Amino acid sequence: MKFYKYISYILHPVLTPIVSTLLYFIIIPNHIPEEFAYRVLSIVFVTTYIIPILLLYFLKKVKLIESYHLSSIDERKFPILFFAILSLLLGNLLLKANIINLLALSFFGITLASGIVYILFFGKIKTSLHTLGIGGLIGFIGIISYQYQLNLLLLLIFLFLLFGFIATSRLKLEAHSMNEIFIGFFVGFFTQIIVYVSYTF
């Protein structure tokens, strides 16, 4: 059981945006100034990792959440809404740079995904954020592959294997049902595609 807990921690969804950003700068053939890339990585790290962690620490301190796992739907509502707003603001900021539009769109995809997750709360559906994160990452890498005509098959296969590990760990830990696992994946994946298609075509 400890193995599955380690998988859940190592592949935590809060890390997805910084991993996506890092892979974007590594993969794309366009020349991006190194200093600019580091600046963007720093902004993404602070906005999507440091700030959410500080928020969770505050919410736990004032006893609005019982644990950092956000086990109940009620505990998830405000953090998800907050993260959606952060992602929207970050997407707008990156879009203004005008040379990393694809990366900016990925954050609009995260905003849309977070919004859908929030709406599903009203149907008492606790979407798996772990599989939402990996689904979004797979969608984003697929978009990069299409946009730049790159063969990223091996990376995509690796990410699908990670999805398998994540899904198995969440099921073994009884954190989610099978439906919640796949809802998370499809919401994460298709929101990236929807935002890209809406902006591009």
Residue ranges and their predicted role:
Residues 7, 67-82:
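Juxtamembrane helix-capping/reentrant segments at transmembrane boundaries
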Residues 7-28:
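The first (N-terminal) embedded transmembrane alpha-helix
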